[in-house]
């Protein structure tokens, strides 16, 4: 039987540390971080995320600003807003809410964010620095996954890890972070043959495929750490990539959906912001 990893608890512990850091700065009369969010249109998921981000910032003591732009805004106007924020010395982090409207060039717009304010770690410059092993901002979900694995107190070093999915935001960066922790990592994707046999050898499985209940009990090695990044709606219920109830019987540790990785990601964003001042 697995231990369910409580992402909310991991997030709360991180937020306490960050609040202590901000409280110390306030006591010393030092500048408090400010993050500016840009929302284009009115995507419901983004609106929920912004509400949650604002709450976390308020709890920690960080200034949060939200800029809302019309969905049909011209690309040049968005870039102008970003460049103004780049120049603003009182803004220390910029979040561009995804997804952008399909009419916009996402890569072009993202790369207008100053790398030193790109706390989401999405710009090409931060990506290049990350894979070269240089100091930079790292995508928050990938960072959160490592934080969750470490919360189990199990060593990552020397372990076999399988990452299901190769996205630039989750799959690839979490694989690199696991390598940095001295794990031996295999990345699986839609063209990988016999994913099950690869998973059965893994001490750590991170699934970010977006296929509901793809990972079954017979994929799992006894005692494995299973991290579910997937998010789907099945029969009106929110589910992940892992067949949770059955995998729970065999894994050592497992994250639920909801209440797992998604609870930690927003806090990692604020941790990145605070790193600017360290």
UniProtKB/Swiss-Prot annotation:
GO function terms (MF aspect): methenyltetrahydrofolate cyclohydrolase activity; methylenetetrahydrofolate dehydrogenase (NADP+) activity
GO CC terms, sorted: cytosol
- Kindly tell me the pathway this chain contributes to: One-carbon metabolism; tetrahydrofolate interconversion
GO BP field: L-histidine biosynthetic process; methionine biosynthetic process; purine nucleotide biosynthetic process; tetrahydrofolate interconversion
Q: In which residues is NADP(+) bound?
A: 165-167, 190
- Which reaction does this chain catalyze? (6R)-5,10-methylene-5,6,7,8-tetrahydrofolate + NADP(+) = (6R)-5,10-methenyltetrahydrofolate + NADPH; (6R)-5,10-methenyltetrahydrofolate + H2O = (6R)-10-formyltetrahydrofolate + H(+)
UniProt KW keywords = Amino-acid biosynthesis, Histidine biosynthesis, Hydrolase, Methionine biosynthesis, Multifunctional enzyme, NADP, One-carbon metabolism, Oxidoreductase, Purine biosynthesis
Recorded E.C. number(s)? Answer: 1.5.1.5, 3.5.4.9
Assigned protein family: Belongs to the tetrahydrofolate dehydrogenase/cyclohydrolase family.
The record's function comment reads:
Catalyzes the oxidation of 5,10-methylenetetrahydrofolate to 5,10-methenyltetrahydrofolate and then the hydrolysis of 5,10-methenyltetrahydrofolate to 10-formyltetrahydrofolate.
The record, for NCBIfam families, names: PRK14172.1 (NF010769)
Q: Assembly state and interactors?
A: Homodimer.
- What is the name of the protein in this document? Bifunctional protein FolD
> What species is this protein from?
Clostridium tetani (strain Massachusetts / E88)
Native organism taxonomy: Bacteria, Bacillati, Bacillota, Clostridia, Eubacteriales
């Amino acid at each position: 039987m697995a231990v369910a990893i409580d992402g909310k608890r991991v997030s709360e512990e991180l937020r306490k540390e960050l609040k202590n850091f901000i409280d110390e700065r306030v006591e010393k009369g030092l500048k408090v971080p400010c993050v500016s969010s840009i929302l284009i249109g009115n995507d419901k998921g983004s609106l929920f995320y912004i509400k949650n981000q604002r709450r976390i910032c308020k709890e920690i003591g960080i200034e949060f600003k939200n800029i809302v732009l019309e969905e049909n805004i011209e690309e040049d106007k968005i870039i102008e807003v970003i460049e103004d924020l780049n120049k603003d010395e009182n803004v220390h982090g910029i979040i561009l809410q995804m997804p952008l409207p399909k009419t916009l060039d996402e890569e072009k717009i993202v790369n207008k964010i100053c790398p030193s304010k790109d706390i989401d770690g999405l710009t090409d410059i931060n990506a290049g620095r990350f894979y070269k092993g240089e100091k930079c901002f790292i995508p928050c979900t990938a960072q959160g996954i490592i934080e969750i694995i470490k919360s189990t107190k199990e060593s990552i070093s020397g372990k076999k890890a399988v990452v299901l999915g190769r996205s630039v935001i989750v799959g690839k960066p979490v694989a690199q972070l696991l390598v940095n922790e001295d794990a031996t990592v295999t990345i699986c994707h839609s063209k990988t043959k016999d994913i099950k046999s690869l998973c059965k050898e893994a001490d750590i499985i991170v699934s970010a495929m977006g296929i509901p209940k793809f990972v079954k009990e017979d994929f799992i090695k006894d005692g494995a750490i299973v991290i579910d990044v997937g998010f789907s709606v099945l029969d009106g219920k929110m589910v992940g990539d892992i067949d949770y109830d059955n995998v729970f019987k065999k894994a050592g540790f497992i994250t639920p959906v909801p209440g797992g990785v998604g609870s930690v990601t927003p806090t990692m964003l604020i941790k990145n912001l605070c790193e600017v001042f360290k």
